[in-house]
Amino acid sequence: MPTINQLVRKPRRAQVTKSKSPAMNVGYNSRKKVQTKLASPQKRGVATRVGTMTPKKPNSALRKFARVRLSNLMEVTAYIPGIGHNLQEHSVVLLRGGRVKDLPGVRYHIVRGALDTAGVADRKQSRSKYGAKKPKA
């Protein structure tokens, strides 16, 4: 516990909160070739690698992921939600924030049904989260 004198000399500092999706807080000025402070809810990018990885203990699966070069020139790892996907290298994807708890280093999700990413086929429930169209009656 500091004394009053110590607090007078060096006051308490407010805690700085760190962003959970830092790539979303950076823009890029291609004319000046400089990064800018421009936060956005989604970012467009190009898939540079598509693959699977195994989750942390105690889970076991092959989770689909894509390495994406964003429009702000940052490269991030993003999760591909849903069953089956049509992504390959050079696919243009839309990213949103949101981590995957059992995949270390994966802080972003790919938006299904946007740009080159197809929605999940034969999806009846939670369709809006997976970009699936309403089935014909």
UniProtKB/Swiss-Prot annotation:
Q: Which residues form a coiled coil?
A: none
Q: Where is this region: Disordered?
A: 1-57
Q: Which InterPro entries match?
A: NA-bd_OB-fold, Ribosomal_uS12, Ribosomal_uS12_bac
Any idea which GO molecular function terms this record carries? Answer: rRNA binding; structural constituent of ribosome; tRNA binding
Purpose: With S4 and S5 plays an important role in translational accuracy.
Q: Which NCBIfam families would you find in this protein's record? A: rpsL_bact (TIGR00981)
Query: Can you name this protein?
Result: Small ribosomal subunit protein uS12
Q: From what organism does this protein derive? A: Lactococcus lactis subsp. cremoris (strain MG1363)
